[in-house]
């Protein structure tokens, strides 16, 4: 078959017309070094701080060091098979995680992927993990309580919705137990909970999830896990992921509580990443921006105004404030609260609950030290009845500690001192509480009332726990309406006081202690 020149030119023209040119610009680079989960990339032109970089095999790395001729990125996941010369691509996206009510009752990893074997999560929305905290104008003052269910905390160190209250202490002093009990106490309060586990053993986390499920609190809780076996990058990012999930509720006029367990391990993970990225070390080998690491996280816990919620939801939610309350946990070494990370977090938060090893081993649990534990903004959020009744509790405990130390050197004490010691001893005993047994407002108020009004003078110290249990059981049976009213309103007036007096006196008349 022979073609003349005209036919050949026509065929070429047809082919040219039909030829579909697809141009796709890809921001591509090459891995030049891989070590300890850190990759250096050459050739990526436009990269943002914190951008997701796509790696071979569907994995991602996070761009953290932006140098003149290279990019330092930390791999999120396994990195053993990455090699020099591999091609990587910039995505132009900041890390986002799924958010929304679909995550409640689930256990997820740092990236929001389910790890509980209950199937995929059909979340409709995603949110960036790094968000600027609400400004001063967008905030409201903290004046609504978060009941932890602990007598010692709710009476002496009250926590409000939108507050940041640090739980600090040595290892094995009950920090996680306190945070888990606070979450369990929210199951009927309308507050959603997020528990972020950072650098813990998988067995410990599994135990926490099981306890939440047993006590019916998992259904309104999201558990975010970055266990000890996961990379430093995922441990560093886990609190920000959990915070983004909590902000979903805050920004829509709901209330949420987030526990970071614990930020010491997050700081260590960030130190590891920073040193591998060859950033200059500072005090205790932490990088210079370790304060900013925690401040930008904890400032996102806030109570936001009605106008902020209305603006965020485009008018769908009106007249409601939202809040995110944070309970960060810090582990100290031999009670040293003056170390770098503890002092940073103490200065960022609105107060701290200090748990002491000496108290814990002496059987005072929760091991709260009332001397150096404080809540800077929770007082205005405290329930009215608890605020009215608990004024003398902290004083009684402080005086008792002082006198107990003095009494060791003196055998003959006057009657007033003996009374103070006896009262302080009984208040200390009364503040003890079992794990997984948070108390309602009414129960706390009744026990504190009995202590403050002198109804425990004739009760032996050894029988105090039985007295408390019997009193609460009697009150729930005979004064159910009063209990319901106080649990709902938290009010205090002369009429309620008279009913309390009648309740305790009737109880003491029926039984001998």
UniProtKB/Swiss-Prot annotation:
Known EC number: 7.1.2.2
Domain of life: Bacteria
Alphabetical keyword list: ATP synthesis, ATP-binding, Cell inner membrane, Cell membrane, CF(1), Hydrogen ion transport, Ion transport, Membrane, Nucleotide-binding, Translocase, Transport
Membrane-protein topology: Peripheral membrane protein
InterPro entries attached to this UniProt entry: ATP_synth_asu-like_sf, ATP_synth_asu_C, ATP_synth_asu_C_sf, ATP_synth_F1_a_nt-bd_dom, ATP_synth_F1_asu, ATPase_a/bsu_AS, ATPase_F1/V1/A1_a/bsu_N, ATPase_F1/V1/A1_a/bsu_N_sf
Main location as per UniProt: membrane
Positions contributing to ATP binding: 169-176
Compartments where found: Cell inner membrane
GO MF term (any one): ADP binding
GO CC term, one of those recorded: proton-transporting ATP synthase complex
Reactions catalysed according to its record: ATP + H2O + 4 H(+)(in) = ADP + phosphate + 5 H(+)(out)
One Pfam family named in its UniProt record: ATP-synt_ab_N
Site features described as Required for activity, chain residue numbers: 373
Function comment: Produces ATP from ADP in the presence of a proton gradient across the membrane. The alpha chain is a regulatory subunit.
Subunit structure: F-type ATPases have 2 components, CF(1) - the catalytic core - and CF(0) - the membrane proton channel. CF(1) has five subunits: alpha(3), beta(3), gamma(1), delta(1), epsilon(1). CF(0) has three main subunits: a(1), b(2) and c(9-12). The alpha and beta chains form an alternating ring which encloses part of the gamma chain. CF(1) is attached to CF(0) by a central stalk formed by the gamma and epsilon chains, while a peripheral stalk is formed by the delta and b chains.
PANTHER family: ATP SYNTHASE SUBUNIT ALPHA, MITOCHONDRIAL
Family the entry assigns: Belongs to the ATPase alpha/beta chains family.
UniProt protein name: ATP synthase subunit alpha
Species this chain originates from: Aliivibrio fischeri (strain ATCC 700601 / ES114) (Vibrio fischeri)
Gene that encodes it: atpA
